[in-house]
Amino acid sequence: MNKTLKPLFACLFSGLICTGAAAAEPQVINIKTDGSSMVMSVTSDGEVLFHHFGGRIDDAAPVTGIKSYRRTDHGTDNLAYSTMGGRNFREPALRVTHADGDMNTELRYVSHTTRTLADTNVTRTVIKLTDTNQALDVELFYTAYAEENVITTHAVIRNREKGSIVLHSFYSSSLPVKARSYLLTHLYGAWARESQVDHTLLTHGSKSIESRKQVRTTHTENPAFMITLDSESFDENYGEVIAGALAWSGNFRLNFEVDEFNVLNILAGANPYASDYTLGAGESFTTPEMIYTYSSE
């Protein structure tokens, strides 16, 4: 090779490597409180993946770079808001029949914004998603209360199709969690014996806590829970705990699904039972607010 061409080829080759490395780095969304972080990333094809909810992380890049060593066509990607469609085999957060009868929904990233609200203790992140084939948009709202270590979330579903669509499932939140074990604590009861405490070690498969009793729900099944991570016994003095509560007085459902990779996917929101909702063209639907907190103390 001509000596004058060698530096040129070397420069071009190194440039391609650098460009490829830069392109491979995912866009990171890190929602933070004083003591916790909720970390997501955007893949090269626009999927928004969920990576972490736990202790605060200031540099989230290493978390998003952890490889799962499993094929994406297994249908178990940790999507930030799962849908019925594509290769998702988990219980979906959103299930829709579109105006043309199609039931496939695949959401992709459009943009996201983060701003501080009037109360400087509070920041709000909005992630905008759109369907790959239909005129359907979803906005995910995350509001972080720094001092309280609380993050609330809800979804807004917007119909830009020419006709009405039907919402079959419209959960407020989809939260994938990875640990060795999961101990679920929740409350149940009846008249004169409300707020009984129940502890359940989650195994592979699904467990649901739900109510179909309309406005008189919480004295039988309460729309709140705690998940103790990496422990098979409940202790009030130590351990990692994720707690959640749904700000909704009607029919609700909390679904806990542990898959074959030992990932726990938590769905929380209004109960989809007998709740099909027709959303007209140009209309939007806002889900109830889901409240999360994390503690390791």
Task: Name each model feature, range by range.
Residues 1-9:
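Bacterial N-terminal signal peptides that target proteins for export
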Residues 10-18:
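Bacterial N-terminal signal peptides
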Residues 20-24:
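Boundary at the C-terminal end of the N-terminal hydrophobic targeting segment
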Residues 25-39, 47-257, 273:
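Polysaccharide-binding surfaces and accessory modules of carbohydrate-active proteins
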Residues 261-271:
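Short, structured beta-strand/loop micro-motifs enriched in basic residues and often containing a Trp
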Residues 293-297:
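Short, Lys/Arg- and Gly-enriched loop/turn segments at beta-strand edges
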